[in-house]
Amino acid sequence: MSHTILIMAGGTGGHVFPGLAVAEYLKAAGWRIVWLGTEGGMETTLARQQGHALETIRFSGLRGKNVRTWLLLPARLLLAFWQSARVIRKVRPDVVLGMGGYPAFPGGMMASLLARPLLIHEQNSIPGLANRILSRLADRVLLGFPDAIKSEKKAVFCGNPVRDEITRLAPPAQRYAGRSGSIKLLVVGGSLGAQALNTIVPRALKRIPEGMRPQVTHQAGARHLEALKQNYSEAGVEGELVTFIDNMASRYGESDLVICRAGALTVSELAAAGVASILVPFPYAVDDHQSTNAKFLSGKGAAILLPQSQLTPEGLAELLVGMSRGQLMEMACRARELAQPDATRCVAETCMQMVAV
């Protein structure tokens, strides 16, 4: 008999991509996948591309919205609750899995109310408000980082699911061995880009003598490529400048060092790949959770945590020049030791176990 899971995730890739990895694992095991997303969200396209059934609700984020939006919140929540309950009654899932994002809170609340087995996955080291509430109602709380939510009976540390091609990369000691010449630097700002990195990195590279300068690939973000090209041109520095990177596994595998933000999925990918990194947490993240994410690696000598307030061309240039290949390989090896390569299996099989309870 085939089982059905309702996966609730939306808003950003940090929620959606781990959910898709779990969906593929369960689909291969014979499960029927139904995805609960939000109208117009990136998840609607991605879920359909992978052949999953899709249901949507109308709900979105609230932080930073105007007074009118907040006044309408009760009505919007009631609508989202009603739509979520209608989907759950229609789909009749054996298990409901919340991976975060806008649909997960109303969907999780209704799953609990309708007595469906509910699991939530918290990607970050500090849980958001929605998961702090849902953790009290869920049957299992799956963690991307140890001790994010303290519950001896419910909590299961699985790690964050990442793409298989990243976990299959050769060990860093094997990849880094024998490399010579300029280090290969990968700068990743995410799909939206990171203005601080786009501005500071080319200025830092300008300060490094050309013979010592890293070979750089810089991912700008969809709307920032032209501005990034201008920044590099003004600095007199050459680099491979791109809006998006299709094959991150390959890029991680060939890079000696990555400079990036410290989102939960990014930190987990760096560990899974086994690559040295300089992490510049987004300073306006809720509860400053990116700094705590970064400390998962930096606290073990697997990365360097560089607050954005301390990110300067002079300081970054000095840091880059002072990093030896031996140090980079040691950081990469330590990162790989912190990886959770079976995170997808852990999340999926915990869902399977709920059917047998």
UniProtKB/Swiss-Prot annotation:
One of its GO terms (cellular component) is plasma membrane. Keywords: Cell cycle, Cell division, Cell inner membrane, Cell membrane, Cell shape, Cell wall biogenesis/degradation, Glycosyltransferase, Membrane, Peptidoglycan synthesis, Transferase. Transmembrane segments: none annotated. It is found in: Cell inner membrane. UDP-N-acetyl-alpha-D-glucosamine binds at residues 12-14, 124, 163, 191, 245, 264-269, 290. It catalyses: di-trans,octa-cis-undecaprenyl diphospho-N-acetyl-alpha-D-muramoyl-L-alanyl-D-glutamyl-meso-2,6-diaminopimeloyl-D-alanyl-D-alanine + UDP-N-acetyl-alpha-D-glucosamine = di-trans,octa-cis-undecaprenyl diphospho-[N-acetyl-alpha-D-glucosaminyl-(1->4)]-N-acetyl-alpha-D-muramoyl-L-alanyl-D-glutamyl-meso-2,6-diaminopimeloyl-D-alanyl-D-alanine + UDP + H(+). One of its GO terms (biological process) is lipid glycosylation. Pathway: Cell wall biogenesis; peptidoglycan biosynthesis. InterPro entries: GlcNAc_MurG (IPR006009), Glyco_trans_28_C (IPR007235), GlycoTrans_28_N (IPR004276). One of its GO terms (molecular function) is UDP-N-acetyl-D-glucosamine:N-acetylmuramoyl-L-alanyl-D-glutamyl-meso-2,6-diaminopimelyl-D-alanyl-D-alanine-diphosphoundecaprenol 4-beta-N-acetylglucosaminlytransferase activity. Cell wall formation. Catalyzes the transfer of a GlcNAc subunit on undecaprenyl-pyrophosphoryl-MurNAc-pentapeptide (lipid intermediate I) to form undecaprenyl-pyrophosphoryl-MurNAc-(pentapeptide)GlcNAc (lipid intermediate II). This is UDP-N-acetylglucosamine--N-acetylmuramyl-(pentapeptide) pyrophosphoryl-undecaprenol N-acetylglucosamine transferase. The gene is murG.
